Amino acid sequence: MFHQVWAALLSLYGLLFNSMNQCPEHSQLTALGMDDTETPEPHLGLWYFIAGAASTTEELATFDPVDNIVFNMAAGSAPRQLQLRATIRTKSGVCVPRKWTYRLTEGKGNMELRTEGRPDMKTDLFSSSCPGGIMLKETGQGYQRFLLYNRSPHPPEKCVEEFQSLTSCLDFKAFLVTPRNQEACPLSSK
């Protein structure tokens, strides 16, 4: 009798614990797909880097000196090519321009980007529950991180909280939010 009561109490405790510690299902991480007839048009234009998550702080260290980053995604000169230009505003106020070329590759129905000149780097795009938001999962040599971008430089705080909650459930415990205290640097046209 004692064992049955004890088992019932443990089961009740387990149910209560699980109901309070709910992580979203992995299926809530929705990959953005694109087939050969579609264009990446919904993803073109300006994006602001908001936050990042990784397993370790070292995987986010590249963003430590950053105040804000603004990106412009444009169609490339070749099919299935994207041009990404960015301007990084460091915490010390310096503007650092960057540019990358991405190739859209076949990735099991999801939109997978490969960075030219970086064969080890893969980027997957995921939808975000945040209006105007998108999540990227970057995988490279020795790192894996999720990055949150938004069309607005200052999305609702709830967006950042949901991103942190989701990535924490995926065991990405290191978290970084860009301060975005300074004005974004102008994007160069080159």
Swiss-Prot record:
Keywords: Disulfide bond, HDL, Lipid transport, Secreted, Signal, Transport. GO terms for cellular component: discoidal high-density lipoprotein particle; extracellular region; high-density lipoprotein particle; low-density lipoprotein particle; spherical high-density lipoprotein particle; very-low-density lipoprotein particle. Expressed by the liver; secreted in plasma. Tetradecanoate binds at E138, R145. It is found in: Secreted. Residues 1-22 form the signal peptide. Disulfide bonds join C23-C169, C95-C185, C130-C159. GO terms for molecular function: antioxidant activity; lipid transporter activity; phospholipid binding. GO terms for biological process: cholesterol efflux; high-density lipoprotein particle assembly; high-density lipoprotein particle clearance; high-density lipoprotein particle remodeling; lipoprotein metabolic process; negative regulation of plasma lipoprotein oxidation; reverse cholesterol transport. Coiled coil: none annotated. It holds the Pfam family ApoM. Belongs to the calycin superfamily. Lipocalin family. Highly divergent. Probably involved in lipid transport. Can bind sphingosine-1-phosphate, myristic acid, palmitic acid and stearic acid, retinol, all-trans-retinoic acid and 9-cis-retinoic acid. Interacts with LRP2; LRP2 mediates APOM renal uptake and subsequent lysosomal degradation. This is Apolipoprotein M. It comes from Mus musculus.
